[in-house]
Amino acid sequence: MLNSKNYLALGLMSGTSADGIDLAILITDGRSKIKLGPSDYHPFSKSFKNRIKSVFKEEVNIKNLKKKKRIVEIENEFTHLNFLAINKFLKKNKIKKDKIDVIGFHGQTISHNPSKGYSWQIGNSKKLANLLNINVVSNFRNNDIINGGQGAPLTPIFHYYLTKKIKKKVCFINLGGISNITYFDHKSKTNLNNILAFDAGPCCSLIDDWVTQNSNKKFDNFGLLARKGNVKDKIVKDFLKKPFFTKLPPKSLDRSSFSIKKLRKLKIKDGAATLNYFVADTLLIAINCLPDIPDVCILSGGGRHNKFLVELINKKIEKYKILLSENYNWNGDSIEAYAFAYLSVRKLLNLPITFSKTTGVKTPLTGGQIFTFI
């Protein structure tokens, strides 16, 4: 008989935009039962965000002692910020620590390079577990990469069960720092091995970087800046010449794979417009890789707040029905935090989180490492 226990899990996510921590409570059996609880967001200060970004692209086997020390300092601060955010979140929602079965702690990605055999997330899981007296699951990507997978995306299994009641062919699009797509057919009895998922291209990370480097803003609110700009088609075409876009899925992307240097001579509004058009084009390319036309495309992630980008996506893929996650009463800012809460429970149950058509592994694999508190 299957273990039908329901677990109360807390998920923590800091994405490639590196703007803060998403927190979410989930009640689940680690399989098809999913109940979304409260969620919240804890922003990073501008100075800490800049410190994190300063160590992006670093190789996992750094030999420079000064750089090593700096990353350890940033990791300790990052871990402490997660600890503070959790305490504030639990107090606000009147949740006692001893009621939480497990924490799914993604950490902050510094570098993702599956071709070299690693994906590096900072965050001291053992320290966090001991501070909170709650077991923590992290290092979700390593087992997949060791076994020949891309280590990303990891959220498709959660997307699949979250949308189980939508008896349609579904395309779930996460507009995060990097955009990714999950496709499955709930009309038929889809085997988990038939879930298709892959990274589509850069998204909010590039747009936010451009805006923060050229203004005192953290992001282009609602895409108002981009809306005023003129797209530079040649730059968009140059971006799209990257081999990544002709590579067949499954595939994954590091935030540092693309640079905004091509835009440096542009006005801020024109650069923003150009990047938005580029992102929309990458999604069109990605959706054309799907085995069938989806009945509905569901947008989640921070990019869905960019009304200009959403309009462009609608124009590019106008033959598809596009809805926001809020149409289903899901907070689109918290989907990935919910997902890592879910994945942590699957680790406790030794259930797989990656599959041949999501990351390229030969057989379904479990993922994550359990850090027990002392």
What do the predicted segments below correspond to?
Residues K97-H106, D292-G303:
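Short glycine-rich phosphate-binding loop at a beta-alpha junction
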Residues N216-V296, K307-Y320:
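A contiguous, well-structured pocket-lining segment that forms one wall/lid of small-molecule binding clefts
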